[in-house]
């Protein structure tokens, strides 16, 4: 057995790491979390305005998934049928990670047209 195939056979991704990247790497999730981290609680309409490239249908799906994963929660106010979304403690813990991603992207990602 060669050194390369032995190394490949010995390597195994951590299931928790895989799940984390499955959540954070899903299109729009990072942007949704970034808006909530940067600007706090948001109504659905606020998120629609701040992430205009994401369709309403997909945004609803992502919000439900992030809620199921424990990163955000939907809070309903007594006097209003519509609620707002906010980060849970778990979601708030991403602040440092997102700051590091910002630093990395400033250093390595070239600005391109938004088209």
Each PLM stretch: what is its role?
Residues 25-26, 40, 70, 91, ...:
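Glycine-centered flexibility sites
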Residues 7-9:
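Disulfide-bonded cysteine motifs in exported proteins
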Residues 59, 63-66:
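Basic amphipathic alpha-helical segments that dock to polyanions
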Residues 11, 15-58, 78-86:
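N-terminal helix-turn-helix DNA-binding core of bacterial DNA-binding proteins
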Residues 34, 67, 102:
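A cross-family signal for key residues in well-ordered alpha-helices
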Residues 2-5, 14, 86-115:
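Amphipathic alpha-helical dimerization/coiled-coil segments
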Residues 67-77:
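A short, conserved structural fragment
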